[in-house]
């Protein structure tokens, strides 16, 4: 099938190639033989009058033309999938859908475990692929590479729809045996102590609590940066370090680690944990069902 001289089947080939940036991997992802893939690439290069890829050492690099084509091609294929190809009616009890979700260990431990338990009862064949926080979840949503992102709204873009799940507050914690900890810390004492800091996906942007401190002209002394909240309690235990964590997560970890909440002269900020999904999934019955489950479970917290 051709549209204005372009074999539309080649769009699938081009998307696979732009995603994998490797002929063998791209061919495998769409079940093409290596010779068929090479022939398709030659036709694409001829149509666009562009090499599409160049070699930089051992790395295959997109040409400027290919960089421009990548989001347009993926968007076109997603639109066809979500808006033109008709969906089968979604039956949770019979579905084997796998949802790909980016979320933190905080969201997993205090919220998503309940979602998993409920889904296991209502839709036993539905499964999840839980992925760690990423530096650019917006791009993954745009490409349709994930179904949901669960994050504080502070980190979300306005490019995709979202819904608030629950509000949470940060608290400062330390080890109960740390004799340097007074009942209440001044902000000056708080920023001077050794901190364990959580950063979203290793991003350079300030975290919520760091943004709060910057607004008050303060900068804390960070000794250790971690990418999972679950790494904090063992690194606080038996030390003079302190950390800033979501309150519900502190309550969770207090069952297994000695943690003491330390008062500050002013409460640390409250944030809203939210769920975001690709715009093209707005009308996807499976996505709608999953969103309803999450919102219902969040309302019970």
Curated annotation (Swiss-Prot):
InterPro entries: LysR-type_TF, LysR_subst-bd, NodD_PBP2, Tscrpt_reg_HTH_LysR, WH-like_DNA-bd_sf, WH_DNA-bd_sf
Keywords: Activator, DNA-binding, Nodulation, Repressor, Transcription, Transcription regulation
GO function terms (MF aspect): DNA binding; DNA-binding transcription factor activity
HTH lysR-type domain boundaries: 6-63
Domain of life: Bacteria
DNA-binding residues (ranges): 23-43
Family from the record: Belongs to the LysR transcriptional regulatory family.
Function statement: NodD regulates the expression of the nodABCFE genes which encode other nodulation proteins. NodD is also a negative regulator of its own expression. Binds flavonoids as inducers.
PANTHER family to which the protein is assigned, alphabetical: HTH-TYPE TRANSCRIPTIONAL REGULATOR LEUO, HTH-TYPE TRANSCRIPTIONAL REGULATOR LEUO-RELATED
Protein name, as recorded: Nodulation protein D 3
Taxonomic source organism: Mesorhizobium japonicum (strain LMG 29417 / CECT 9101 / MAFF 303099)
Originating gene: nodD3
